[in-house]
């Protein structure tokens, strides 16, 4: 049983973001058809694979209509809201454009490069730098289209809830990209300024860093004191481990450059995979920096059936499939007619998630009207409280402190789950089951509970028990290694994957609620963050299999006559230009 079985979608036009939106909807079972799709590039062909081409007659019966284009273009093509409403007055309409359908920039041209600069993402992507003459860069793989398409799919599913007839959504890709940097936006809003790109002090890598290896690099994150103690033992308890400069996390931040030099001297003689395996054995999050080609034969991804065959004979190439395991059962769900002013009015969410990805998901759900109850541990709480993140991600949520090591607290958690519609958790694999809060037990108690698990590599497969953070998975997937200038070593960079996964998970929850409300099916979701990262890297993965594996190239592009960033007056002022 598909999540969106019977949900009819019409995708209009050549835009890549619209194609991404349609791809995600199709991947969870929606009936997606196209009017005038683009198949001219391998990426466009992959995104539109399996979507029948139809005439405008299909608009009359659609539940959701997706259009990409600037307002003047849409009016000229009779694809604006007035024209579409004349054909279908009940469908949710989703418009995607670089800067939105209104405002002084609404009809301005844009490209992936210029959107990364105008949104502020380019200056954040690689983290702080030693030399401001190093230009900011865009990420690999047409990421503006993927973020814009994900935002459209998420907003579209909220707008298409059964009681939201005739809703209109206006997605600005620039705004969707800017929202990826919630912490930075919060800092700018509270203090009136953003962080400098210039690295002025130690400490930039004290929570996550890249170590040189004999055959490449390994990313590692011994950020907590207990992880640091385990990592010292894994390294053979070096004498410098007793240096008071490194005794606590604040000490390691203050003396990071000296510490990184010592760890690098230890790591250089070893293979990158051995370093990561040694760290993981000590329960310290770590992964080698991989090339994209290495992912194509990953035992973990093969085990989970992530790859799908694409091409005329379905054997031409491997392309990413949906980044989650999904089951939908009629084990007690009952079709319902929701009421209320917002898409998720009346929905209650039990939130066991923490840090960035899960709390981002539940923040979106709260904004759409859900009653979110956030569960935190006594004393420790969500690490997001240590930064400005909680100011944003904690909005609109209620909270409860439960010590889940105590049977009474577990009993209270079960009681809460019996009264909720959705549960979201991102603990390490096996934790919720050991607590007696696993999907099988809670869905037996509450047959209508939508249970969403998010983890680094998924809940099944040979690597399912690896401990992970989103920034490390950016390195493991091959993303971080490509996001740099050719002569610059790889950096971990900005936490890109976490907020992107939050957006995708919010979409999945909205789709699961549509299914339960309309057809009574109840979903169990097993979400893999690395699969989500690779899902957005479809273009470089396809290029790799054609013998044109991508290499770091900064802001350069082979598809444009002029494409790059140019320095202007000021310490760190740049302009991005893209000429076709």
Residue ranges and their predicted role:
Residues 39, 379, 386-392, 406:
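Conserved core of the PLP fold type I
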Residues 133-142, 212-215, 487-497, 568-572:
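Flexible glycine/proline-enriched surface loops and loop-helix/loop-strand junctions
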Residues 119-138, 477-493:
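The feature captures the short pre-catalytic strand/loop hairpin that immediately precedes
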Residues 361-364, 390-400, 406-420, 440, ...:
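C-terminal structured domain segments across diverse proteins
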Residues 43-56, 117, 389-404, 475:
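N-terminal glycine-rich dinucleotide-binding loop that anchors FAD/FMN and/or NAD(P) in oxidoreductases
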Residues 1-41, 51-102, 147-381, 410-414, ...:
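Acyl-CoA thioester-binding alpha/beta core of soluble enzymes
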């Amino acid at each position: 049983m598909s999540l969106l079985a019977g949900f009819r979608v019409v995708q209009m036009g050549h835009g890549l973001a619209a194609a991404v939106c349609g791809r995600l909807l199709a991947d969870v079972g929606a009936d997606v058809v196209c009017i005038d799709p683009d198949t001219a590039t391998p990426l466009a062909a992959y995104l539109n694979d399996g979507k029948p081409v139809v005439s405008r007659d299909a608009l009359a019966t659609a539940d959701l209509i997706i259009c990409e284009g600037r307002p003047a273009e849409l009016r000229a093509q009779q694809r604006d809201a007035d024209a579409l409403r004349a054909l279908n007055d009940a469908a949710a309409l989703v418009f995607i454009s670089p800067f939105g359908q209104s405002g002084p920039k609404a009809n301005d041209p844009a490209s992936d490069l210029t959107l990364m600069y105008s949104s502020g993402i380019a200056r954040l992507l690689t983290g702080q730098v030693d030399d401001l003459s190093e230009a900011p860069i865009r990420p690999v793989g047409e990421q503006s289209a993927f973020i814009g398409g994900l935002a459209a799919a998420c907003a579209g599913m909220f707008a298409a809830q059964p009681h939201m007839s005739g809703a209109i959504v206006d997605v600005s890709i620039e705004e969707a990209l800017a929202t990826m940097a919630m912490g930075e936006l919060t800092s700018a809003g509270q203090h009136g300024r953003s962080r400098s790109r210039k690295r002025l002090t130690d400490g930039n890598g004290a929570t996550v860093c890249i170590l040189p290896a004999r055959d490449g690099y390994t990313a590692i994150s011994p950020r907590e004191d207990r992880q640091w103690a385990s990592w010292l033992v894994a390294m053979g308890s070096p004498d410098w481990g007793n240096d008071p400069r490194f005794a606590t996390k604040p000490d390691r931040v203050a003396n990071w450059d000296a510490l990184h030099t010592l760890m690098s001297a230890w790591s250089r003689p070893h293979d990158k995979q051995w370093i990561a395996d040694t760290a993981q054995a000590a329960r310290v999050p770590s992964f080698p920096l991989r090339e994209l080609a290495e992912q194509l034969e990953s035992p973990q991804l093969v085990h989970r059936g992530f790859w799908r065959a694409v091409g005329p004979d379905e054997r031409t190439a491997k392309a990413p499939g949906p980044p989650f395991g999904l089951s939908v059962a009629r084990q007690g769900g009952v079709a319902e007619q929701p009421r209320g002013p917002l898409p998720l009015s009346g929905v209650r969410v039990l939130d066991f998630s923490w840090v960035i990805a899960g709390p981002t998901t539940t923040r979106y759900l709260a904004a759409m009207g859900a009653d979110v109850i956030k569960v935190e541990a006594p004393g420790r709480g969500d690490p997001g409280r240590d930064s400005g993140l909680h100011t944003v991600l904690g909005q609109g949520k209620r909270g409860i402190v439960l010590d889940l090591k105590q049977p009474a607290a577990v009993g209270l958690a079960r009681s809460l789950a019996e009264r909720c519609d959705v549960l979201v958790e991102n603990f390490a694999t096996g934790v919720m089951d050991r607590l007696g809060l696993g999907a099988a037990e809670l869905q037996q108690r509450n047959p209508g509970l939508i249970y969403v698990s998010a983890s680094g590599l998924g809940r099944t497969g040979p690597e399912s028990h690896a401990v992970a953070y989103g920034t490390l998975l950016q390195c493991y997937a091959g993303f971080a290694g490509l996001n740099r200038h050719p002569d610059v070593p790889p950096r971990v960079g900005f936490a890109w994957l976490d907020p992107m996964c939050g957006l995708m998970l919010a979409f999945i929850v909205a789709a699961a609620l549509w299914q339960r409300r309309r057809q009574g099916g109840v979903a169990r979701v097993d979400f893999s963050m690395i699969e989500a990262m690779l899902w957005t890297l479809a273009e470089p993965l396809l290029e790799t299999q054609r013998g044109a594996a991508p290499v770091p190239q900064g802001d350069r592009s082979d598809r444009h006559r002029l494409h790059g960033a140019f320095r202007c007056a000021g310490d760190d002022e740049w302009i991005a230009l893209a000429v076709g």
